[in-house]
Swiss-Prot record:
This is Type-2 serine--tRNA ligase. One of its GO terms (cellular component) is cytoplasm. The keyword Metal-binding applies. The lineage of its organism: Archaea, Methanobacteriati, Methanobacteriota, Methanomada group, Methanococci. L-serine binds at A313, R344, R361, S362, E363. Signal peptide: none annotated. It comes from Methanococcus vannielii (strain ATCC 35089 / DSM 1224 / JCM 13029 / OCM 148 / SB). Keywords: Aminoacyl-tRNA synthetase, ATP-binding, Cytoplasm, Ligase, Metal-binding, Nucleotide-binding, Protein biosynthesis, Zinc.
Length: 514
């Protein structure tokens, strides 16, 4: 996508030459637009192509790709400009307006032609060959705050996707993205900083060399265990799940049976066992010692073909346990696992603490009759929402658009029974993201119907219907959502957390860090 914006920042009075000089310092600082942009994608962030001052107006031409879109970029300029000139020059910002905004989406000609006649509220749609142009005119600060631009883009992209949608959209009886419940915090939120930035500066976390990995120091580890215990006590134990220890190194054959390899093969870490040839490894070691670098090409020769993945969903071993077994749905099974990390390769999408490649979850998996499976899913979601209310955490629950077992798949050639709603996703509000109301997904409650039952040949001994379901409570994300709303001051935290944490441990002090 390409974004081309003509807009203006309107001040409370004419901008003096002295104030203009200070504003230019902000305009020339591109770091404002790079926050949250993945490494290597900086070229897709907002750029100021030209600017000029006209009395009270700062007139801007801006462009961008997908990251820090131009309409987000112009809004981001407000705060640093006010910090520069507000007090020193007694000038305020009265409004931010967009005179004209052209958003271009590239697609196949055949798909573009199918959008002919489509009406998008509050904007104009122009179709030109392989290009879809969404054109806004005279958009004010109020419309920006209502996210009409992002909604219009999502609307058009959804219309495109309908022509080639994931199986999720075909299966789901309620439109993905529909909010089914929400809760507004009773207290006033007074913390608006990025929890990742502050956690780093305080020394609660430190970036690990691997992409999307972090070292969690004692204060953060203490908070992890506090939330883990709370989720077990307030959610998992109330539904009487039994704890198991699930393997985290999953054979490729298991992933094949799950059909995970069809939907998201690019989202996993693949594991290659080494060849048992010590003399060949000695050559590798010798070369490394002499060259003082790791000879990757030689190492590749010493590895067998990929045979495993690191668990990307955490529930994989559950279905393997019942592979080609006869079960009794009158004796349903409810297991949970909290024994280790889950791994997903996010590539360039890994950012901050809320989207990582290595994360901790408490994973519940169950099997029984369709009615039982649906009731358990509803209970896991209910108790998660109850916990958020007890902690006075603002949240909403929506119909998910990416149940892990359907993600990326366009069709299923088997006679699979799917639930009306495969996935609900509960999100905690992130108040530091001001351009739009965003949340971090903390609980994912899924029903698979007969998807895994068919894949693993699981049958009821009376030939009755067997379904499965799973709910993941993402510890890493629960903590990010909590810190985003409460901040890092122990005294500001609710008693429910303090009673679990008791006393916060100290951070090891070094000369150079934190």
């Amino acid at each position: 996508m390409r974004f081309e914006l003509d807009g203006r920042i309107i001040f409370s009075k004419d901008v003096t030459k002295e104030a203009q000089i200070e504003i230019l310092e902000v305009l020339e600082n591109r770091d404002i637009f790079l926050k949250g942009v993945p490494e290597g994608k900086e070229g897709d962030a907002s750029k100021i192509e030209s600017y000029k001052f006209e009395g009270k107006d700062l007139v801007l031409k801006m462009t961008s790709g997908t990251y820090t879109r131009a309409h987000e970029g112009i809004v981001r300029l407000k705060k640093p400009i006010m910090e520069k000139i507000g007090r020193n020059h007694q000038i305020g910002i009265r409004d931010v307006t967009i005179d004209k905004y052209v958003i271009t989406i590239d697609s196949e000609i055949s798909k573009v032609e199918q959008l002919k006649g489509l009406k998008v509220p509050e904007c104009e749609l122009k179709l030109e060959g392989e290009k879809i142009n969404i054109i806004f005119k005279n958009v004010g600060d109020g419309e920006l705050k209502r996210n009409i631009i992002d909604r219009a883009i999502k609307f058009v992209k959804n219309e495109l996707d309908k022509q080639d949608q994931d199986l999720t959209y075909e299966v789901c009886k309620i439109a993905p993205g529909t909010i089914v419940s929400e809760y507004q915090a009773q207290r006033k939120t007074g913390f608006f900083s990025d929890p990742t930035d502050l956690a780093e500066s305080l020394g609660w976390v430190k970036k690990f060399p691997g992409r999307g990995q972090w070292f969690y120091t004692p204060p953060m580890a203490k908070l992890f265990r506090a939330f883990e215990n709370l989720i077990i006590e307030e959610c998992i134990q109330k539904i009487e799940f039994d704890e198991c220890l699930f393997p985290k190194l999953i054979p490729l054959d298991v992933m094949y049976k799950m059909r995970y390899l069809e939907g998201l093969p690019e989202g996993m870490y693949y594991v290659c066992p080494p060849k048992r040839e010590p003399e060949m490894f000695q050559d590798f070691v010798n070369e490394m010692m002499i060259k003082k670098e790791i000879p990757i090409d030689k190492l590749k020769e010493l590895l067998r073909d990929p045979a495993y993945v690191l668990a990307p969903a955490q529930c994989e071993p559950f279905y393997t346990l019942f592979d080609h077994e006869l079960v009794d749905i009158d004796s349903p099974v409810k297991f949970f696992d909290k024994s280790g990390w889950t791994y997903r390769w996010e590539g360039g999408g890994a950012k901050g603490l809320d989207r990582v490649n290595e994360f901790l979850r408490s994973e519940c998996v169950w099997m029984g009759s369709p009615k039982f499976v649906e009731e358990v899913r509803d209970d896991t979601l209910k108790y998660a929402e109850d916990l958020a209310k007890k902690l006075d955490l603002e949240y909403w629950t929506e119909v998910g658009d990416d149940p892990f077992y359907l993600e990326g798949r366009k069709k299923d050639d088997r006679s699979i029974e799917f639930p009306d709603v495969p996935k609900y996703e509960m999100r905690l509000w992130l108040p530091h993201i001001k351009e739009e109301r965003k949340g971090v997904a903390v609980t994912s409650a899924n029903i698979h119907g007969t998807h895994f039952v068919e894949g693993f040949g699981i049958k009821d001994y009376k030939d009755r219907k067997v379904w499965t379901g799973c709910t993941g409570f993402g510890l890493t994300r629960w903590i990010i959502g909590f810190l985003a709303q409460y901040g890092f001051e122990y005294s500001d935290w609710p008693d429910m957390i303090k009673d679990k944490v008791l006393e916060m441990p100290k951070i090891p002090k070094m000369i150079t860090w934190p």
